[in-house]
Structure formats: C-alpha cells, structure tokens
C-alpha cells in the first residue's frame, strides 16, 4: 500500500492511497512536492503527519478507511491485520495502535 503525495489538479499537491491490495509494504511516496507541502497535505487529508524527511506517521484508522472500500482482494482484512501486526513486531506501530511509522520514498513517475 502506498500513500502518495503528488501534484494534482491545478498543480496543487494531493494525497491519495494506491496499490491498496499490496499490503506487503506500506510507504509514503512523495512526488515533486516540498517537505512543507507534503506535511500540509498529509495533515489536511487526515492520513498522517511527517515525522522527519525520511519517515512519516500514518493514521491507521484513516488509512484503512481510505483503502478498504476500494480493496478487491478477498482476504484484504486479514492482510491488513497481518500488516499491522508486522508493524507492531518491528516497532513501527505506536503504543496505542493509532499510527504506523513508514519510510518516505520518491514517487517514481508521479
């Protein structure tokens, strides 16, 4: 699953959740946006917040709400639970389970 922050309509940055059936990884991918634009768009969308230039905290409930209605994998919910458990075991899930720490990478082709 990828949360992208890319330049959208009218050259205004927007956040969108893509590759929703690929729960083997969860990352934040930035297109041609500044760090400030990425931080603003993430917070405005409710999907999360930047932690630093290389990591972000994604809101688990908001991410699931954005992705699940569009999921096509029959076992998507079980895959989601496995992804969250993997984040917990790797120390990337907040103590309250509300956010998942993810890597920031470039949105190739964005």
Provide a role label for each language-model segment.
Residues 66-110:
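Short, compact, well-ordered microdomains
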